[in-house]
Amino acid sequence: SIKELAEAGGEIAEYTHKHPLGFLPASLLTVLLYKVVPMSVKQVQEEIDDIVADTLNILNRIYKGKYESDKRYLKELTEMAMLLAHSNISDADAIRQLGEGWTAEETWAIALFCAIRHIDSVENAIIASVNHDGDSDSTGSVCGNIMGAIYGYEHIKERNIFCPEGKKLEETLELSEIILALADDLSTGCIISEYDPIDTPEKRQWYERYCKMRPAGIHSISLPKNNQ
């Protein structure tokens, strides 16, 4: 359920970010990605403000009676990001108003601002999200998550976004096959258990990847002989 997803997103972030303003933005991001993935690009472009507003409402319901001041501040910052995205203020000036991205709530707000303002262009959204003096790798990463969820891998791959001239995405992105395999496995869900036999090729591959830490089925990676 969406409640379980949102709670899981927050709980995972809480392992390293104990303050509510550290893990609540992760919960928001989880809900937002969940909502936009099944939607068409056109629908997201037309309804992004409503989607974000609904995401805030869902967060409030899930953490009802908890972290009230933190939720209120996060809501205000999120709404400010949305307002700035539709304003005439330059990207740089708007980002400065939202912070520098050194805290989770600022990272969320900056990434969201860039995604909404440049909802029609993955390239422009990412460029805006990393062109500031703050924690630009974090804001770029979160913005990339949002834009990737909206547009999908195939769109990015076909356009060879940010690739050197004459190079394809899979040739430019480091460890691209491992990243794609991990994404596919995450979307599939775990297919092995300590109580069940490893009796199919698919289960064997999972066992090799996540119990033995070997890149089984990923042909571009070869391990040193003493690690095989």
State what each model feature region is.
Residues L5-K64:
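Extended accessory regions or peripheral subdomains of proteins
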Residues S1-I2:
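A short mid-domain helix/strand-loop element embedded in enzyme catalytic domains
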Residues G9-A13, H17, F23-K35, E106-T200:
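Catalytic phosphate/nucleotide-handling subdomain of diverse soluble enzymes
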